[in-house]
Structures are given as structure tokens and as C-alpha cells.
Amino acid sequence: MLRIGSRCVRSVPKSSLRVSSTKIGKLFVRSVSDKPEEVFTKLSDENDPQRDAFFKYSWGTWLKNDKQEKEKRITKFSLEGLNSVIDDLYKQSIENAKRLSKSSIPPPAYLPNLTVSLPHNVKIENIGTVNPNEKIRIVSMASIHEGKHHRIYKIDTNAEKSFVLRIPYALDDENTLAYRLKSEVATMDFADLKLGLKVPKVYSFGVNALNPVRQPFILEEYIEGTLLMRSWTPLENDAEDGKSHKDKLNAVINPISKFQAKLAEVKFNAFGSLYFAKDYKTSEESAYEGETNEELKDRWRIGPSVERCLWRKKSTLNFDDRKQYLGPWDISSPLDIVKCTGLLEAENARARLGLVQAHASPEVVAEDILKDQIKTFDNLAKVAPDLINTKTTSIPKMENLLKPRLHHPDLDPMNVILKEDDDVPYLLDFEGSSIKPYILQNTPQFVAYDGPKIYDLEKDIEGYKDMEESEKAKLEFMYKRTRNQFLWEFALNENLPELISSVAPPIKVLRNPYVAAIERKSDEEYLLIEEALLQLAEVWPIFANNKLVNAAEYPLKYSEEEVKKHADALNAYHEKLISQPFAATQGWMPQDMFDNLVQGGILVKNEKGDYVISRTEDA
């Protein structure tokens, strides 16, 4: 989910492809060297077998079903088709120079080849030029990142201009990918033109495999620089001066907090996600009020939300059946977002259960887990209407917390690059962005912490000085996580003081079930949602007395047997996370670590072709 310069890639090998109009060349071979092994290929040879390795996933291995997981992440595309798209951009830039003023912002151009270009970005000053008799061509490519959801290539041309090509993995159905790409580009466009944020310029995109690239893609500006993550040291020890460690941490926190503040500036007319007007013709309503720039007035619309939880692994459901849960939602009904999230997940679990019971499921999942998921998500939907009293006066400036604001799901130092020449931060990868009330927007993952809070080790922990070093280390970890979150919330108060109530402890407890739902990564994590619902039940009477919720009694009833069953299941899940390496990442591990564990005999292949910990290692 980031785009980085080759110098910013962590110490892993990169694949590099040199393209020739005359030679057949080589493709990369994975190597421990930081220098890529070059491979040459002929541009017109679409069937060159040497290219195959260039498109295969190589940054990690799954302990189970590795072959199938990697096949889903093959990003084979047409080099010749990509070259034609880039060449056409240069032709467009010449025409744009003739017909557009420097400040002109025309609508996106929907082209016959089923790509879309953004004319205000496709300018000679942005993409360069070649000699009049010379045709633009790709001269080399490098794979610079293999992320969770897409792969990123750096494309170099004979115009001495580099581009970034982003290709999503085929993990979802075509409709999901199309909606996701349309919204992502429109959101980046909005962030650039309306908010003035530093983001990569998008030149062209295609939402399906019918375009010349033969893959959904985004072609955007390449920014040379250093990832902000390089400066993030979350376990930094407190300095003796009591200040310099905060300065170091805030050097990362503050730029991201300022991005968040800019994203929250505009109050929208509905909840959902942004699209270009032509990509969402269902609505004629402007995305927001008060626009004075005529070229921006009808540029964007609010359509179905592309928040990841609403689309991820939902292909079991018919797309038309899914759409009823995706919004857009009226500005007067913010809690419908929570309700629809629960209803959609419950319906998806029912559909999956039906396939399992009919012995037609392509996945291995226990019936009991799916049945419990259905119950949990139905519970979330049932609680939703009463979850927050939107008229309460107990929370200061509640009306501000309920207004529709842009939410970026990956505010993270891994998603920010400091430009090489001036260290200006650029925010990357807007995939999954949505518009929802700030009261439902969770703390960014890099600073989020929901464990025991320790603000001062010696004052808060009795006998801390006399403890064993191992016990001190655990408490110091909690302290540093608490400290980092506090620094984030302090920055929030500096940059968005009208929204500081969003991090009040009661608000966090109220939104915890929803946050657990949108952050769920595995089937068993429904237990975290149920745990949040049970915790909410304990404090509901207090919240009701203070008019924070809409019902005097908690909408859910739990028997002692149900509470015990849940506690046992949650404990078993936590034990699994401890006893099974990489359970939290669904069995995925970085490739260099996997190679070392196999070479050391710690991981061995079983009769099914999966990798397990060696029995001798257990002994």
C-alpha cells in the first residue's frame, strides 16, 4: 500500500526488466543482493517466458496453500499495451498544451481504449517530452513493492521520465476492483485539487482487463524520496532531558496528523465514498456545498462506500445483493453505516455457510465459526441504532463528530514519502477511503493501543524499581504504547481541536464493536467484536444514565452459558496466536525469514505440501 523509490526499499531484492525494441532479453532472478539482476526482453514479444518471474509474487510465503495464494497475486500485464498508453499520454500532452490554459481543470477524459486520463495532470511540464520524430518507449521497469492489495512497478522511459504503475491483485471480483479504482483515483484527485494535499499525480487509469494494459491499473507520478517509516521508532527510550525523544516521535506523528486535519476540512453531503461524476450517475447532488470554482462544482459525487470491510471476501454474495448495504447513506443517519456493516457481514457468513453445508465451498472453514459469526454480526446490526445518542449534550460539540468527513484508512508512516529535494511529505495510496462521521473513525494503527494505560512507570506501578527485568520490559512496552497514543491525541487537539472529543474514553468504548468489525482480518476475529459488545453491556447503564446511548436497556441479552462459551473461545484464540507462529498474519511470513527457517530445518514440508514446525524443533 505504498509507492517508494528504489533507495527506500527495505533490504530485499528488486526485480528489474530492461525493454528493447530489438533484443530479447533477460528477466530478474531473486537474489540476496540489493542490486537487481537485469533481464532483457523485446517489447513486442508478449509471450516471452522470461517475463514470467517478473510478474510472480516473491516477497513472502504462506505456510498453507502457498501456491494458490501466490497465483492470486500474479500481475501479468501487457508491456506493449502499457507502452501504447504512455505514448498516447504524450500525444495528449501536446494537444492539452494547445487547448488548455495553465490553470484549467477539465473533466476526466474517457477514451475509446477504455482508459481514463486526467488532462490537468497530463501536461508537458509534468511528463516531459521527446524529439518530434521520436516515439515514446519504455526502456526499463523495476518491481519496487509487493503490498497487501497491489503490486507497484517503476517504469522508466526514453524521455527520462519515470512513472509508477499500480496493479491490484485479483483477490476480489471485477466489480469490486472497478469501484475501488474509480473511487481511489477520484479521492486522490479531490485531495489534490480541493484540499491542496501533496499526493502523486494520476495520469491514467483503467478499471478492468479490457484496456491495452490488460489489467486494472493506475499510472501515476513517481516520487523519489525516503519513507517516513525510516524515522519511526515507537519503542524509543525516554530521553534524560524529557523532551528530545518526544521531538523524534513527533517528527513522524505531526506530518500525519496534519494530513488527517486537511482530510477532515470538508463536510460532505452524505456518507459513502467519492467518485467522478461520470462514474456515479445515480446521483446529481454535489458532494459538498459552497464550491466557488466552476470547474470543481460538478466534478465529484458521493456513491457506495469502498471501505475494505464492505468488499473484502464478499464474492460469495451476488453484487446486486451487496449494493443495498454499501450506501451512500443520508447525512441524518450516521449509524446506518454500522448497521449495514453488521447486516452485510451476517449475510456473507450465511452465504458461505450455505456453500460449506452443500459441500461446494472452495475454502476450509468450520461451520461453527460461520454460525457464530452470523450471530455476532446480527448483534452488531441490532445494537447499531441505539449505539450513540446523536442528540446528546454530554459530549462537547457532538454535532462536529457526526458530520461526514473524509477518512483515509492507511494514515501510516509506511504510506508517507519525504520528497528527495525538499523533504516535503507526500501521502500515498488512498485505496479504501470513505466518507463517514469522525466519531466512527478509528485511531491510525501505527499509534493505536487498547491495552492497559501506563502514563508514568514509577507513579502508576507500585514497586516498579524492584521488579525483575523481564517484568519491567513488559511494563515499559505498555508505557511506550500509551505514550505514543497520547502524543497522537495531543497532536489531534492541536490540529483538530473541535474533534478532540472523538478520543474520549466513553466514545472509544461505544465505537469499539464497529472498529473491531472493520479491522477484522481473519474468520476467528469475530470473537473480538463479540468481546467489545460484551464490554459495552457492562457499562451501558452508566452510558444510558448520561444520555450517551439511545436506549435505557442494552439491546442484547447474554446468558451465563453464552458468556462462558465466548470466554473459552477467546482464550483458545489467544492461545492459538501464541502457539502458532504467524497465525495473526494468516500464515504469511517475509521471504527472507521463510528461507532462513527452511534452511535451518525449523520449517519442514508435510505430505500436503504445507509447511509446519519441525517435530525435532518442538522437542
Curated annotation (Swiss-Prot):
Domain of life from the UniProt record: Eukaryota
Transit peptide feature, positions: 1-31
Family statement drawn from the similarity comment of this UniProt entry: Belongs to the AIM9 family.
Record keywords, A-Z: Mitochondrion, Transit peptide
Subcellular location: Mitochondrion
Protein name per its UniProtKB record: Altered inheritance of mitochondria protein 9, mitochondrial
GO CC annotations, alphabetized: mitochondrion
Record-linked InterPro entries: Kinase-like_dom_sf, Mito_inheritance_9
UniProt KW Mitochondrion keyword: yes
Keyword Transit peptide: yes
Originating gene: AIM9
Species: Kluyveromyces lactis (strain ATCC 8585 / CBS 2359 / DSM 70799 / NBRC 1267 / NRRL Y-1140 / WM37) (Yeast)
